[in-house]
Amino acid sequence: MRIEPLIQGVVARSAHPYGCHASIKEQIEYVKKAPKIKSGPKRVLIIGASSGFGLAARIALTFGGAEADTIGVSFERGPSEKGVGSAGWYNNIFFKQEATHAGRTAINIVGDAFSDSVRNEVIEAIETYFEGEVDLVIYSLAAGVRPKPHSDTFWRSVIKPIGESVTGASILLENDQWVETTLEPATEEEAEATIKVMGGEDWESWIDTLINTESVAQGCKTIAFSYMGPEVTHPIYLDGTLGRAKIDLHQTSHALNLKLANFDGGAYATVCKALVTKASVFIPALSPYLLALYRVMKEKGTHERCIEQMQRLFTTKLYDQPKVPVDGERLIRIDDLELDPQTQAEVSHLLEQMNTENFKECGDYQGFKDEFMKLNGFNFDDVDYSQDISLETLASLKP
């Protein structure tokens, strides 16, 4: 069968396995040429390792100088009668192939990161492959739901404003349409559920588990990813349910920092730049900002994807420095290039002009959509998309 791109709204319903491999190789090539991580960690656990920042961090730490061995946890779908499976499934497979070829250990654990069974599997893998200890734990889950303990019910996250409704534009990638949407404010219950799913509680629970099983090495660090953004994004992001969850994550980093101080380690929330990811295209009213930001940062030569952000994080912030540089709230900031005042002034100017008629010319819509397609293995020049791929071949690939 031939695998074609299939998009519903802002959700990709297909992924191209060999395109996913091309994406992995492209990111590996970038970090091999970039400034090297000199004093990085050797044994890394990534919770949420199959796409976005988690995957980019895994690639950077393995191929960008640190030569790390990794255990990656993710919840992904393999091939079946229903379809070829998710991009993350193939990212896991081809990352492992490349890492193994380079002489590195790469263990993939596919399952629900909130479950006890997956935690037990991770502890066992740390014992087996890492001599019982990890040097770095990266928490990069982008889940929409979290099971309630000892129950059949779930907490569900929502992307909504708090207090008052917000009107803004979303862009449906399926048909390249600009759609005005109004989001009603979240209820208190919805805001609390979003904190449960996307806040710091599960991150802290993972670190507690690792401490209690004596799986934390001397000097062990942990990071989780956050976003704050400029004022124009605050109504839907920082002042909304997502922002509440991220503030909870920031507070958790301080509690974990105290716990890891016993091991001469540390915990940090890392504030990243706005990017096209599987998660970010879901956020209403963020798309026009991304189009304007991509255009301005590319024109200035400061644009970064996940992989550039992660390589810079490990070489200039988390490692290779006498001390981890943080802001007044003890956050690592790699959103500095995005929030440059001149960049933001130019972005604001574009947003004032942007509308349903001109968004493709006014912003970098082509770059925005291209990046989305590449998340799912499409739009790579060196991949033959006309080739037939059998489900049996795909089923033989194991993460």
Swiss-Prot record:
Annotated metabolic or biological route of this protein: Lipid metabolism; fatty acid biosynthesis
EC identifiers of the protein: 1.3.1.9
Catalytic reaction annotation: a 2,3-saturated acyl-[ACP] + NAD(+) = a (2E)-enoyl-[ACP] + NADH + H(+)
Family designation: Belongs to the TER reductase family.
Function: Involved in the final reduction of the elongation cycle of fatty acid synthesis (FAS II). Catalyzes the reduction of a carbon-carbon double bond in an enoyl moiety that is covalently linked to an acyl carrier protein (ACP).
Subunit description: Monomer.
Protein name as catalogued: Enoyl-[acyl-carrier-protein] reductase [NADH] 2
Organism the protein comes from: Vibrio parahaemolyticus serotype O3:K6 (strain RIMD 2210633)
